[in-house]
């Protein structure tokens, strides 16, 4: 097999390499999406992907004008909560801040206060802002720049829970006992002010050095309790590290790209547990009331679970037949190449998620969290959160759900279905393009890989390549679970396709 480069054997990725040897990268602003992997690749151009899938990244001028002039529709209904020292925790540089948190210790356990951006306060029913959000459904996060659900005047300013700014919010207060189980819930509209804008990396360092911000000093403890709670132990909760693409100079004065795994701080998972907790409380609330909007996911089939266990063993993990997959995943370090690979494989167990209206008590659970669940914590980037939240507020106050909610609920569900499919397609296309771009420089080279699955009858296999950390197709069917040397046959940017061959040249 011909190659313009000297043949090089690429071995295991060394995650312990010192940071000073890693190359800088321009980050794009992203927010936590616990069901998806984050890809930081601002050094690449994803506009062709956006055009192919019809993703609109901008807004017409009149939409910007409407967003800039919008005011709080519920100003007279708010409880003054400005005395509460909320803080936000997000990726570095983020300005679309949906959530702020404060955790207190009480006699019976803990009280979790969670302030959520009140987007409904700024979106007038029947307005152009409502129409565009009903069309888009959710923010689509391309790695170079996002296609936002709302204009920046809202998502990064008036509705965002920015540090030091008085903001309208929907505030949840959830009491937990000493085991982390829910004992009481309160939700209302309020005015809040974030005291600090924290990022995950610095918060993790602070936690490890005993100087975590007082407002979240209990977050690690509460997060761990929630992970260990009865419903959560057997749930399939993914902890996928992000990946970033860096530009690396060649010896011949050219350059190529590499993928680096971004270590996932524990504080990120603990923070995600607060969002999951709130969504589970909201789901239970709506099911008991007999109305609302749920996030649903049917349990994985026995066949898909068996396939996952086989792939885990092929990657070198030990998983006993009786061990719940959720419990196994909690034991895996996602910041290693194999750990990231098995977390990505576990995504297949969460296929088929959707949204449903609660009707006549006939409600589906979300097997990914282990109970009823609703999306209510990310209204800046997801349409349905705005509407599900109104159900919860109505239930809590004993009032009717607003007509502007019930009038368009079916459209909201349809838009979420369509936009979720679109977001998944764009995610996959961006990842495929990234992997093809990174590997293009190494066409014809040999790589070390482990065989995740093998189909001799089709003369094909699925591989996990150690460096760069990619899952890819292979011509040839080496034995599952074995380490093999394979040759990169194709890295096609136009087709966004990567293909290896075995045996290696």
Protein language model regions, located:
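Electropositive polyanion-binding surfaces
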Residues: 2-42, 46-52, 62-482, 491-499, ...
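Residue-level recognition of conserved beta-strand edge/terminus positions
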Residues: 487-489
């Amino acid at each position: 097999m011909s190659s313009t480069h000297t043949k090089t054997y690429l071995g295991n990725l060394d995650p312990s390499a010192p940071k000073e040897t890693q190359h800088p990268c321009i980050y794009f602003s992203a927010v936590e999406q616990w069901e998806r992997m984050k890809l930081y690749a601002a050094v690449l151009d994803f506009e062709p992907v956006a055009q192919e899938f019809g993703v609109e990244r901008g807004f017409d001028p009149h939409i910007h004008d409407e967003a800039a002039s919008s005011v709080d529709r519920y100003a007279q209904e708010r409880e003054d909560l400005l005395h509460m020292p909320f803080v936000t925790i997000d990726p570095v540089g983020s300005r679309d801040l949906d959530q702020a948190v404060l955790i207190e210790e009480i006699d019976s356990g803990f009280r979790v206060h969670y302030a959520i951006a009140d987007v409904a306060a700024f979106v007038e029913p029947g307005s152009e802002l409502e129409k565009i959000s009903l069309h888009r459904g959710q923010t689509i996060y391309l790695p170079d720049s996002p296609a936002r659900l709302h204009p920046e005047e809202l998502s990064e300013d008036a509705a965002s829970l920015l540090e030091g700014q008085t903001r309208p919010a929907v505030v949840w207060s959830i009491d937990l006992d000493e085991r982390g189980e829910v004992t009481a819930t309160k939700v209302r509209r309020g005015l809040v002010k974030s005291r600090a804008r924290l990022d995950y990396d610095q918060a993790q360092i602070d936690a490890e050095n005993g100087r975590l911000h007082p407002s979240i000093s209990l977050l690690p403890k509460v997060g761990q309790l929630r992970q260990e709670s009865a419903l959560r132990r057997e749930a399939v909760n993914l902890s996928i590290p992000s990946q970033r693409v860096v530009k690396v100079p060649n010896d011949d004065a050219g350059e190529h790209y590499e993928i680096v795994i971004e270590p996932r701080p524990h504080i990120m998972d603990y923070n995600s547990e607060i969002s999951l907790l709130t969504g589970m409380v909201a789901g239970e609330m709506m099911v008991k009331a007999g109305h609302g909007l749920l996030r649903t996911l049917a349990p994985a089939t026995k066949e898909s679970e068996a396939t996952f266990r086989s792939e885990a063993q092929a990657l070198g993990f030990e998983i006993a037949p009786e061990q719940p997959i959720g419990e196994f995943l909690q034991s895996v370090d996602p910041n290693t190449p194999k750990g990231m690979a098995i977390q990505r494989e576990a995504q297949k167990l969460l296929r088929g998620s959707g949204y449903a209206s609660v009707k006549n008590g006939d409600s589906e659970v979300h097997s990914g969290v282990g109970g009823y669940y609703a999306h209510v914590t990310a209204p800046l980037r997801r349409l349905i959160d705005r509407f599900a939240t109104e159900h919860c507020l109505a239930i809590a106050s004993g009032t009717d759900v607003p007509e502007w909610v019930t009038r368009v609920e079916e459209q909201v569900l349809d838009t979420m279905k369509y936009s979720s499919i679109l977001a998944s397609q764009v995610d996959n296309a961006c990842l495929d393009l990234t992997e093809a771009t990174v590997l293009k420089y190494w066409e014809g080279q040999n790589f070390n890989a482990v065989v995740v699955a093998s189909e001799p009858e089709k003369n094909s296999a699925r591989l996990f390549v150690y460096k760069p950390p990619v899952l890819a197709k292979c011509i040839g069917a080496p034995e599952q679970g074995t380490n093999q040397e394979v040759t990169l046959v194709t890295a096609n940017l136009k087709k966004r396709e990567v293909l290896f061959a075995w045996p290696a040249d």
